[in-house]
Amino acid sequence: DSLFYDECLLPHLLTVEQLSPRHRRPGGLFSVVHLMGSHAGYANRYPASFARFAAKDIPGSLSPGQKEKIAAYDNSVLYNDRVVSDIIKHYSHSRSIVIYVSDHGETLFDDPAHPDFAGHAGNTLPANVVRVPFLVYMSPSLRREVPKLWEQILRAQGEPVMTDLLPNTLVSMLGIQTPYTRPELDLFSPRYNANRRRTVIAVDGAKQVFPPHSAPSR
């Protein structure tokens, strides 16, 4: 467990405008920010000022220890929301897109097959572990500059998605053409395949299959 919180990364964020002329490239700047987020242990992921929830705030017939862990998780989510918000604010005044996605979720004593388990494991695939947030932000200046891309992003709201298409989506969004580019795996493409079956496979071979379905009505 780290003694540092994710906010320690904020002073190191750069926009392309902050780069010296010697380091600027015509294609702009691509950055990856890897957060600890709400990884266990949850109580170590946020400062005391974000300890808003306690065991007494958690309903149900769980044990005091279980309620305390859930409260710590909720606090870590609250803090993570603040950090992600600060990242977005940092880039809101530049020509930027921010994409936030989690690599996995957590189960907190709510998996009927493992009612005493909290966390994520390679051999269990409850819905709360495999369903993750996927957020896209585009700054106002970039929306004005590339309105077509912004319209494509808006059209993608609510589409069924799986994180394995993120690399293809990023490459296409950045205007990079490769022999491996597949528009049906580009979330923002008009040719995106919303009917693709999405399968998650655990380390022991267990599967969680999300059946294909049409894009939601708007």
Identify what each model region corresponds to.
Residues 1-218:
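Catalytic domains that recognize anionic headgroups
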